[in-house]
Amino acid sequence: MAGMEDAVIIGSGPAGHTAAIYLGRAERKPLMFEGFMAGGIAAGGQLTTTGIIENFPGFANEITGSELMAQMREQSLKNSVRIVAETVCAVDFSKRPFTLTLESGEKTETKSVIIATGATAKTLNIPGSKEFWQKGISACAVCDGALPIFRNKTIAVVGGGDTAMEEAGHLSKFAKEVVLIHRRDQFRASQILQERIKSNPKIKIMWNSIPVELKGSKLLESVTLQNTLTGEKTELGISGFFYAIGHNPNTEFLGGQLKLDEQGFIITQTGSTKTEIAGVFAAGDVQNPHHRQAIIAAGSGCLAALECEEYLSGL
């Protein structure tokens, strides 16, 4: 693409669009690469895979994730953001201006970059996992746990780390029963979280078990479990199935040019979106391995835009 960009945003979730809107209003005319099925997710990010959203401020009536992201995209366009349906596959931060390479082979030069590529939930590739996604299957208890289809029902959670403990605990507030499925005979979660789960009368633990099939008609109705020691299979009637086996940050395209934590999330300065390279910022789930909430990602995008504008003003 011809010309030098002031700011490029990589990613089109709540963090990316919030950053874009703020930079657009600062008259930077930012360029956004929203991605073309990047990480297997449509433009708009992980939120587009969420059904009903009831906890995003400003929407008293329920709205779907896709609808919310469509509104954010429209707002970005109204604020002079140029949106391109391309995926950035490589970057060069070793010299200035920075160079971004697209999957098409085209290159873009820019003075600053905001990385808002998010993180993709790890899922299981088993029969029924695609058919019942958002029809009883979810990867976010905080987002979906209070929905009517899960209230006072039996819900399964798969995982054994801190996230699984937190998700199971949260779901126990709404479900009749939560079944925590783990492939081993002990959790890897912190001891205090384990104790809370084991003392919760609404949570049942299925040790040495793995899900091998999800079944139902229009909605999810059951999960088939296989014992990892005996191979025996049992069927468990459930109305919900929640993945809590972690997330993969979408950072492979960086090629090791930024510092990442042991899970692959971008490391930023405390209380900031600044990376160790001046002019490169990271916002949203790609630099926050803990919360994975749209409103937090959006706030992070706002901070990235403000810090980016401050950086550009100092050049």
Model regions: which residues?
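A Rossmann-like FAD-binding core segment of flavoenzymes
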Residues: 76-94, 100-102, 107-109, 172-270, ...
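Beta1-alpha1 glycine-rich phosphate/pyrophosphate-binding loop at the start
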Residues: 5-79, 165-191, 261
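Residue-level detector of alpha-helix initiation sites
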Residues: 13-15, 119-121, 161-163, 288
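Glycine/Thr-rich phosphate-binding loops of Rossmann-like dinucleotide-binding domains
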Residues: 18, 41, 123-124, 165-166, ...
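Rossmann-like nucleotide/phosphate-binding core characteristic of flavoprotein oxidoreductases
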Residues: 1-10, 25-26, 224-228, 234-240, ...
